[in-house]
Amino acid sequence: MEEIEGIILRHSRRGMSELSDCMPGDFCAGAAREVLTWPRGCVAIATGFCVAGHAETDGPPGAAWVARALEELGFAPVIVTDALCRGMFERENLRVEYVRLDAEDGELRGILERLRPVGMIAIERCGRTAQGDYLNMRGVDIGAHTAPVDRLFELTDAPTLGIGDGGNEIGMGMLAGQLAGRLVIRPCAVRTDRLIIATVSNWGAYGLCAALERLSGRRCLPSPDEAERQIERMVAQGCVDGISHMQAMSVDGFDMATEAEILDALRGAIGRQKGEHAI
């Protein structure tokens, strides 16, 4: 049976599947095992990637499902983002911490002191290059629209996990050397303790949920219908596809049928039957 890591790397378009050779074979399961060792408390989940002045559909939906999974496991998740996602997560009954565009280290340390996270997870959140730029996949600097959420991952003493799909996201600094020769743009330099790579970052988030469910026995992974409704709600609030820049029911150019394929495969990998709902 195909493992979680192989499922979330299906349909690879940007070389992530080739990078799996640089990763532990069980990188998703290993990340889930570590998360389950964290003391129960606040987990900060960073997300929100600026595309044409809007948040993209990749990232926030996956972050919402990881947050729900963590709640099921006894954690207290907090979404950490910027004004790009204002209002989205409150509608999901999730706690949110907003970071200002011009926040400096003192303010960021204050956020960490207030939250006191036992762990931090980034899901499709842009991180700085070694030159200090925030670059999208077209090589355009989006720093004017991107709060320094990545700096929290450098300032914290808590364990960290990054989920990305292109090379410019928080956590991809772990593979900066390998990415440098493969990307047109300069890769993110911000490292995390653990990294999950996927064709789509939402799929990486689903992979984490699947691994958490398999290890804990608790319902963590959404059904295809649940995931589609989550994306629909966020599109209604202004999220756009990262490829087409359109406010549409797609993620990085993949339609909902492909989303369902990935989720059904993950459900099969952990022994869950179709029709069984999540939390």
Predicted regions mapped to residue ranges:
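Short, glycine-rich nucleotide/cofactor-binding loops
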Residues: 19-23, 49-61
